[in-house]
Amino acid sequence: MTSRLRLAIIGSGEIANFHVSAAKRSGFDVVGVAARKNSETVRVFAQTHEIPQTWSDPLQLIAEEDHWDALIIAASTEAVIPLLTQAIKIGKPVLVEKPIATTSSALI
């Protein structure tokens, strides 16, 4: 028997609902979610989707990489680059849901 991949998601907005539903239908175990600091929505989101662990700091979720195998970043555009930079350093698969920047100069 093969184990299911553990997926974490950063973001708890409307589009994140679709990502979690699709991930579960595709056989992932969604094990954690993080959103902005002090966000009540992350707790409600986790309860709604039966996600066992929450983080109030997305960078902390990334740092605790032993808890997950792959990551979806569904955060606001301005938040993506710092999160993606940290996630890439770990070397695990990352799906970025939104544009990573609003200008090409922001990518450099």
Which residues fall in each region the model found?
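N-terminal Rossmann-like dinucleotide-binding module
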Residues: M1-H49
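Beta-loop-alpha module in the N-terminal Rossmann-like domain of NAD(P)-dependent dehydrogenases
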Residues: Q53-I108
